[in-house]
Amino acid sequence: GVSSAASDVYKRQMCFGVMQALDELGIKAGSVFGTSVGALHAAMYAQGSMDAAAALWDNIRLSDVVSEESLAIADDAENIFDHPEKLLEFITRYAHQKGVDVSPLMEILHRLIDEDRVRRSGVRLGVVTTRFPSLAMVEKRLEEMEAGSLHDWLMASASCFPIFPMKQVGGDRYIDGGFCDNTPVEMAVRSGARDIVAIDIGKHRSHTQYDRRPNITYIRTSQPLGGLLTLDSALSARNRILGYNDVMRAFGRMRGVSYAFDAVDAQALYTRAHHVV
């Protein structure tokens, strides 16, 4: 079966463009692995409710989940995703931060994600989080999670400290999985996935060792997607189109770099231009 390794902080609407394209291509994932918001989307995909996920980002207001103080920290947090060697310094700097009250976000997750439905789906689910204070990467698969703990593990993966508080699960504290691995393609590989579609929205190239694996389609975003906490309807619509186009290019249905053309139209344009020249 096909496995999808979802990157994050997913720039939200790009995910839905990606899933729309995969659906049109007839690609159904038997396993989904996600980090941070990508973990939330992975769970929603597993239970077959991506429309609900789209509605979440279409209707949520930033003020529902973060404070103005958190917005000021967002740029620093996003830079750390690209420079993990500075993570300890970053955590120390903001150690006094308690983060915002995430109970409204947890209520949204409980409303949108039904753990029993996810477990019955037959889709294998995995998430990445970061244990604190060791900063060790933790990969957690659905079958390893205690009954009733799925939402806790999803929040552990998406606890972008210090914007959000650390998440305690069992006796350990966790922060955002993106601090360790923003694109859990290696988790998919270790889980035995045969054919993998990996979506990487990071600013810098990562996991380049998988670029030429015949069983891995590694898709990197072709354009900047906006900031960590950007909630803008026009940007969201653009990102959805970018996600769709990037997947279609990767599977040969579209051509182009900065622009995307239907593969047949692109060949016709090339032929016409060649005759003109």
Question: What do these predicted ranges mean?
Answer:
Residues C15-F16, V185, S233:
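Conserved strand-to-helix beginnings and helix N-cap segments that scaffold or border functional pockets
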Residues G1-A6, Y10:
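Single conserved hydrophobic/aromatic residue that forms the stacking wall/gate
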Residues G202:
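Residues in the short beta-alpha loop(s) of Rossmann-like NAD(P)-binding domains
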Residues D75-A198, I216, D246:
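Active-site-adjacent alpha/beta core region of enzyme catalytic domains
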Residues R205-L225:
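Short acidic, glycine/proline-enriched helix-loop-strand junctions
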Residues Y10-K98, V102-S103, L109, E139-M155:
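Patatin-like phospholipase
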Residues D58, L62-V66, D114, S159, ...:
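Generic secondary-structure signature for well-ordered alpha-helical cores
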Residues Y218-V277:
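C-terminal helical/tail subdomains of lipid-metabolizing enzymes
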